[in-house]
Every structure is written in C-alpha cells, then in structure tokens.
Amino acid sequence: MKQFSAKHALAVVVTAGHALAASTQGISEDLYTRLVEMATISQAAYADLCNIPSTIIKGEKIYNSQTDINGWILRDDSSKEIITVFRGTGSDTNLQLDTNYTLTPFDTLPQCNGCEVHGGYYIGWVSVQDQVESLVKQQVSQYPDYALTVTGHSLGASLAALTAAQLSATYDNIRLYTFGEPRSGNQAFASYMNDAFQASSPDTTQYFRVTHANDGIPNLPPVEQGYAHGGVEYWSVDPYSAQNTFVCTGDEVQCCEAQGGQGVNNAHTTYFGMTSGACTW
C-alpha cells in the first residue's frame, strides 16, 4: 500500500494551489493529545471499551438488536464531560446500513431546514434515539456543569454526527470528534453542522473531523450523489504527530479525500497507531 509521509502530504497540499491558503501543517500538543484520547475511546468501542483512559467512567450501554447499533455513555470527572461514543461497523447488519446511500429527510430535527442524511445511518440513529436522549438527560441532570462530547469511528462517526446535531437542539457546549467519518448528509446538513458547531474556522470549531492518510471511507458516499462533509478536517499523516497533522478548511477534496483511497483500507482501520478493537495500545 502506498504510504503518505508528512513530506509527501505537504507536496500534495502545495500542488493543490487554491487549497494552499486553507491548509496548514501542525497543531498544538494539547489539541493533538485530545484527538488521540478521543480516537482511543472510539477504537476501543469495537472491543467493549478495552484500554480506555483511566479517568473515564464507563456508564450505560446503548444498544438496538435490530440495527446492531452499539454505544456507551461515559463520564470523565477530571475534564467534567459526559461522553457518548458509538462503535463502528461490526456486523453484516451494520454493513447493510453502511451501503444504504439513499438520502433521507432528517425528520427528527425539523429545525435543520432542507437537511437530508445518509439513509442507513438515519435508520441506525432512530433505533437508539430514545435511549441516547434519555441517558444524556439523566447524566446532565446529575452533572449540570459538565460539557457534552460525542465521538465515534466510521459508522460510529456518522452516528456521532447525527447525535450531536440532535443534541444541539437541546444543549449548548457540545463537542464532536469523528474519525474516518463517511459523508453523513447533504450540503444543507453540512452547513447546519458548520453553523451549530462554529466550524467556519479552526479557532472556533467544536466539530473536529479527523482523517488519516488515504483513508477511503471519507470519500463515500460520493459527492455526485448529493453528499458533502462538514466540520474542520484534521488530516493525520505518518509518522503521526502534532506536527504531522494538517488543518484543512474550505475545499473538502484537498487533503485526505484527494489521496484516492477507496473504501476500507489500512489507513481507515488505524488512527494514531491504534487499530479498531485491537487493544494493543
């Protein structure tokens, strides 16, 4: 498989010309540590939350047997946050959701005007919506000064995006971290997310869309089918580090999506050296 080094990545960004001004190399160590922490939780969700950070308290399980959607409500008292995490694809049932590209009205969030979202992931979201909203409400009532964080990888990333969108209608101070997120909806949905999560700039964004090397999943579903990405993209290239993380705004095809990756590849299953469910970190 073709490897993407930081040197190669910089050459790609510079060659892009119009994209140069919207792409910068390097993020702070604090932000990098935060992205790695959220990636750890998201990758651990494939294996019943193995090896999560010691400050994380494992709470209630989110599960629907018909869609095989899995998630958890977690709490971190050290950072004063309530974390919702979703597992990515783990079964044939999940795969059926992945491949349902039909754009569907986001009816559970009517204030998202004109929004259509990935049909399969919307089915998954609706199947656990009541659980998620009830469990989050319980946690917020017990810890009213805690922030809300939502995260996930792959299918779990898109579920995290839909969940964060829904919760944003009720709660303030929500942060969203996704890893290897497919395109989750149409341009109206992407615009809604950018507005709701202040994603017009890396200085204000609360929507951190993390990609890796030539991960092929962020290229799906195709833009030709009406899909678009939201959020600020943080593109990690190897060897992974704060310095080798690019901040990409504007044209969504300038960083990860420009590398030509297709579908599930090694770059998709591994983020910051952690492979989905491997628990070797």
From Swiss-Prot:
Tell me the impact of changing T93R: Km value for the C4 alpha-naphthyl ester is increased by 1.9-fold compared to wild-type. Km value for the C8 alpha-naphthyl ester is decreased by 4.6-fold compared to wild-type. Slightly decreased activity on arabinoxylan
Reactions mediated catalytically: feruloyl-polysaccharide + H2O = ferulate + polysaccharide
GO CC annotations? extracellular region
Q: EC top class, in one word? A: hydrolase
Q: Which residues bind substrate?
A: D98, Y101, H268
Which N-terminal stretch is annotated as signal sequence?
1-21
Q: What is the effect of changing Y101F?
A: Increased optimum pH. Active against longer alpha-naphthyl esters than wild-type (C10, C12 and C16). Km value for the C4 alpha-naphthyl ester is increased by 1.9-fold compared to wild-type
**One GO BP annotation of this record:** pectin catabolic process
The cellular location(s) given in this protein's UniProt record come to:
Secreted
What positions does UniProt annotate as the active site of this protein?
Answer: S154 (nucleophile), D215 (charge relay system), H268 (charge relay system)
* A molecular function GO annotation: feruloyl esterase activity
pH sensitivity of activity: Optimum pH is 5.0.
Parts of the chain that traverse the membrane: none
User: Which residues are in coiled coils?
Assistant: none
Q: Which residues are glycosylated?
A: N100
Alphabetical keyword list: Carbohydrate metabolism, Disulfide bond, Glycoprotein, Hydrolase, Polysaccharide degradation, Secreted, Serine esterase, Signal, Xylan degradation
Consequence recorded when altering D92I: Active against longer alpha-naphthyl esters than wild-type (C10, C12 and C16). Km value for the C8 alpha-naphthyl ester is decreased by 1.6-fold compared to wild-type. Decreased activity on arabinoxylan
InterPro entries found in the cross-reference section: AB_hydrolase_fold, AB_hydrolase_lip/est, Fungal_lipase-type
Disulfide pairs?
A: C50-C279, C112-C115, C248-C255
Q: Which family does it belong to?
A: Belongs to the AB hydrolase superfamily. FaeA family.
What functional role does this protein have? Involved in the degradation of plant cell walls. Hydrolyzes the feruloyl-arabinose ester bond in arabinoxylans, and the feruloyl-galactose ester bond in pectin. Active against methyl ferulate, methyl sinapate, methyl caffeate, and alpha-naphthyl esters with chains containing 2 to 8 carbons (C2-C8). Inactive against alpha-naphthyl esters with longer chains (C10 or more).
Xref: PANTHER family: FUNGAL LIPASE-LIKE DOMAIN-CONTAINING PROTEIN-RELATED (PTHR46640:SF1), TRIACYLGLYCEROL LIPASE, PUTATIVE (AFU_ORTHOLOGUE AFUA_6G06510)-RELATED (PTHR46640)
Q: By what name is this protein known?
A: Feruloyl esterase A
The organism is Aspergillus awamori (Black koji mold)
